[in-house]
């Protein structure tokens, strides 16, 4: 059975979690600390006696802030740190029960699907060495069929046996060495490969679960069957490894452990929750549906049973983190019951010019570093001066102030426009060094920034 430690909560301390988030996200320390504490509380709860553990409920978080300030990025990075089943969903994907669209219980099903997939991959990693040996033997069997030896003069199928000779063993050892050195990757072999019956079934919105069950039912029809296929060794190896791993992995244990992990350590991030909030000054049928989504979310967040194809999960101890810009609405416009289920509220700050400068230089995978590495593949050395970084940050900030504020996403637009010509010409400029300074930035973007109409459509 999968180890109990595979999906336990992350053992990182809040300080370590914040330090890890700092490597990728600039600022927003309050949000980082709240998320870090919530994540650590998952671990703390698992250390309690079982009777008390069941009484400790997660403190759900509501993150409030304009677009492009890091809400979604915090969720994305959290997924890699959590060491637990994690799913991110858009609130706008769901509709009230009775309307066309996905119902909120799909969140629970998605969480279990994620956990099962992760557990299955972990189980396959544990048997990787063993299945690679099995796959190697099957490839060698295809390359060197064993000689059939009959007993007596009348050869009967029942008395034929496979008898490797010393010469065969030497040949097999030689081919094994060639196989491991990669000399036979393009050699074609014939194999019996398991048949995977798959059907593409189109289902109406909101009935994806039924379509998935139908696909699974039809796939089971061909279970156990195999067919002969001619493949190169390079193409055959991953197929054989997957096939052998499936034989060694216990699906029942994986499903049971995945459901347990979801119930005890699952984390759900609900983005764009402000889009399902009814505005106080509007009246209309669409707002009824939005409020209905909130009411459908309520039992899920409070704690309910959700039926999935792997079994029923209880959502009582799942941590929910919701986020939204709340441009046209306020968190107080959420239905009161749902407000009470998100006791921790965190406001993320709008980004300043100084933040943009840090975003361009500090993160491990800063945008400037990404462009430098991309152009390096073409043999072009790209360098950004400090005054160039300052000017790029200033332009992004000014355009955000003048138009819609889209936060750090504006930097993507500005940099792409700035380096468009260089990216186009880079295959013909192998070996060159290009320095981007303030003059370079002004030459390529200055006119666009001065003309509000142009910047509105281009930047």
Swiss-Prot record:
Pfam families named in the record: AAA (PF00004), AAA_2 (PF07724), ClpB_D2-small (PF10431)
Keywords noted in UniProt: ATP-binding, Chaperone, Cytoplasm, Nucleotide-binding, Stress response
Ubl conjugation among keywords: no
Protein role: ATPase subunit of a proteasome-like degradation complex; this subunit has chaperone activity. The binding of ATP and its subsequent hydrolysis by HslU are essential for unfolding of protein substrates subsequently hydrolyzed by HslV. HslU recognizes the N-terminal part of its protein substrates and unfolds these before they are guided to HslV for hydrolysis.
Binding positions for ATP per the UniProt entry: 26, 68-73, 271, 337, 409
GO cellular component: HslUV protease complex
Name of the protein described by the UniProt record: ATP-dependent protease ATPase subunit HslU
Superkingdom, natural source: Bacteria
CDD domains hit by this protein: RecA-like_HslU
PANTHER family, sorted: ATP-DEPENDENT CLP PROTEASE ATP-BINDING SUBUNIT CLPX-LIKE, MITOCHONDRIAL-RELATED, ATP-DEPENDENT PROTEASE ATPASE SUBUNIT HSLU
Assembly description: A double ring-shaped homohexamer of HslV is capped on each side by a ring-shaped HslU homohexamer. The assembly of the HslU/HslV complex is dependent on binding of ATP.
A GO molecular-function annotation: peptidase activity
Organism: Xylella fastidiosa (strain M12)
One record GO biological process: proteolysis involved in protein catabolic process
Lineage: Bacteria, Pseudomonadati, Pseudomonadota, Gammaproteobacteria, Lysobacterales
């Amino acid at each position: 059975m999968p180890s109990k430690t595979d999906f336990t909560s992350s053992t990182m301390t809040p300080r370590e979690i914040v330090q890890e988030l700092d490597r990728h996200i600039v600022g927003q320390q309050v949000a980082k600390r709240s998320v870090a504490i919530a994540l650590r509380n998952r671990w703390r709860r698992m250390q309690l006696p079982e009777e008390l553990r069941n009484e400790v409920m997660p403190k759900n978080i509501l993150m409030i802030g304009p677009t492009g300030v890091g809400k979604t990025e915090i969720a994305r990075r959290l997924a890699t740190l959590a060491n637990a089943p994690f799913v991110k969903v858009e609130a706008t994907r769901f509709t009230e029960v009775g309307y066309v669209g996905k119902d909120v219980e799909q969140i629970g099903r998605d969480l279990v699907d994620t956990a099962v997939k992760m557990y299955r991959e972990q189980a396959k990693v544990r048997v990787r060495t063993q299945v690679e040996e099995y796959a190697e033997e099957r490839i060698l069997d295809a390359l060197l069929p064993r000689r059939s030896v009959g007993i007596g003069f009348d050869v009967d199928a029942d008395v034929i046996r496979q008898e490797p000779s010393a010469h065969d063993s030497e040949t097999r050892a030689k081919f094994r060495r060639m196989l491991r050195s990669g000399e036979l990757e393009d050699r074609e072999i014939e194999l019996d490969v398991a048949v995977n019956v798959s059907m593409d079934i189109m289902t109406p919105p909101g009935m994806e679960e039924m379509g998935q069950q139908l696909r699974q039912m039809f796939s089971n029809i061909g279970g156990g069957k195999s067919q002969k296929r001619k493949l190169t060794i390079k193409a055959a190896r991953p197929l054989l490894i997957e096939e052998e791993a499936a034989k060694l992995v216990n699906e029942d244990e994986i499903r049971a452990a995945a459901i347990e992990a979801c119930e005890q350590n699952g984390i759900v991030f609900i983005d764009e929750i402000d889009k399902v909030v009814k505005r106080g000054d509007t009246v209309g049928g669409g707002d009824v549906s939005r409020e209905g989504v909130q009411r459908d979310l309520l039992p899920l967040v409070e704690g309910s049973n959700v039926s999935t194809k792997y079994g029923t999960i209880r959502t009582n101890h799942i941590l929910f983190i919701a986020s939204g810009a709340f441009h046209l609405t306020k968190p107080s416009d959420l239905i009161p019951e749902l407000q009470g289920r998100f006791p921790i509220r965190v406001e993320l700050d709008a980004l300043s010019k100084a933040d943009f400068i840090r975003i361009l230089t500090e993160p491990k995978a800063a945008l400037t570093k990404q462009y430098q590495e991309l152009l390096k593949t073409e043999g072009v050395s790209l360098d950004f001066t400090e005054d160039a970084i300052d000017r790029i940050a200033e332009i992004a900030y000014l355009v955000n102030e003048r138009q819609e504020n889209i936060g750090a996403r504006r930097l993507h637009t500005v940099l792409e426009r700035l380096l468009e010509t260089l990216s186009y010409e880079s295959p013909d400029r192998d070996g060159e060094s290009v320095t981007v300074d303030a003059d370079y930035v002004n030459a390529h973007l200055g006119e666009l920034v001065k003309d509000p109409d142009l910047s509105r459509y281009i930047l």
